[in-house]
Each structure stands twice: as structure tokens, then as C-alpha cells.
UniProtKB/Swiss-Prot annotation:
Residues 95-168 form the PRC barrel domain. It comes from the Bacteria. The keyword rRNA processing applies. The lineage of its organism: Bacteria, Bacillati, Bacillota, Bacilli, Lactobacillales. The gene is rimM. One of its GO terms (biological process) is rRNA processing. This is Ribosome maturation factor RimM. The keyword Chaperone applies.
């Protein structure tokens, strides 16, 4: 079965079985809603167990979750550092022009059919995502995911076409 990362348990929260999660999903309300089923993986990416979300709330930059049947700190202490993942078949369908992070990371980036590099990470600093492009012999390039920069994404071909606006590449 194929799984995709949606968050990491960074600590416990109080004594009632709540955990602090750093989410890496654009769909936190959906991923962590009551009744959602996720898989736990340890720090060596080994499957630990499947869990069901009992509750979810936001607190500062964290998502605070509780698993069904685990209502005390002693039951969840062991999960600190674990990754939360969703099975591929539980991912919902996206609208045209929307993508999951795992579909974008690893794609090759081209400007006018010239290879720029490969997307290695996606940042969420504010209004728009920023795609981090790893380049040969140059510093990483930060590309905002906006229509004037990202001209096209072809998941099947593993390709992103961009127009690097003046000022985005400080190594030119």
C-alpha cells in the first residue's frame, strides 16, 4: 500500500492524550477531522499502526489531535517523532490545476525548454506556495506558485514550465 505524509507528531499536549502535530498538508481540516483514518510510521519510516482521529483543534502553529481509544499521555508518549500518513486510496480527488505536494516534488523545471532544476521542497510562507528548485552548481531557486511564473504543470511528463521573472534569480 502506498502512503503519503500529512504531518509529524512533535510532542504531547497536556495529560489527556493530545499530541502536537506539524502538518505538511493543505487539507488539515479534512485530514484530521474526527473519524479520519491515518497510519503512523516511526522515524525509520516503518509502519507502526493505523489510528482514527477522535478530535482536532488548532493551537498556534500546531494541529492538536487525539486518537480514538487513547485518552492519556501514557498511551501516546511512544508516538512522539512519528509521521502521520494517509493511504493513497483515501486521498480525495482534486480540481483541475490542483496538485498534491508529492506529485510536485521531484518534477523537473524548464524555462523555454532549458532545464532549470528539480523541485525539492514546497514552502508555505503566506498567500502563495513557494517551490524550491534545486539547481546544478547554483543556489536553490525560490519560485512562487503564481500563474505568471508557473506556466504549466504536466504530472505525466514530470515537467513544470516556468517563466522566471526579473528579480527572482539573484544569480543571473
Amino acid at each position: 500500500m502506498e502512503y503519503f505524509n500529512v504531518g509529524k507528531i512533535v510532542n504531547t499536549q497536556g495529560l489527556q492524550g493530545e499530541m502536537r502535530v506539524l502538518s505538511v498538508s493543505d487539507f488539515t481540516e479534512e485530514r484530521f477531522q474526527k473519524g479520519a483514518r491515518l497510519a503512523l510510521f516511526d522515524d525509520k519510516d516503518r509502519f507502526v499502526q493505523e489510528v482514527e482521529i477522535a478530535s482536532h483543534r488548532k493551537h498556534k502553529q500546531f494541529d492538536i489531535i487525539k486518537f480514538k481509544g487513547m485518552y492519556h499521555i501514557n498511551a501516546i508518549e511512544q508516538f512522539k517523532g512519528c509521521s502521520l500518513k494517509i493511504a493513497k486510496e483515501h486521498q480525495g480527488k482534486l480540481a483541475e490545476g490542483e496538485f498534491y505536494y508529492h506529485q510536485i516534488i521531484g518534477l523537473e523545471v524548464y524555462e523555454k525548454d532549458q532545464l532549470v532544476g528539480q523541485i525539492k521542497e514546497i514552502l508555505q510562507p503566506g498567500a502563495n506556495d513557494v517551490w524550491v528548485v534545486k539547481r546544478q552548481s547554483k543556489r536553490d531557486l525560490l519560485l512562487p506558485y503564481i500563474p505568471s511564473v508557473v506556466l504549466g504543470v504536466d504530472i505525466e511528463k514530470g515537467r513544470v514550465d516556468v517563466e522566471i521573472m526579473e528579480g527572482l534569480d539573484d544569480e543571473d
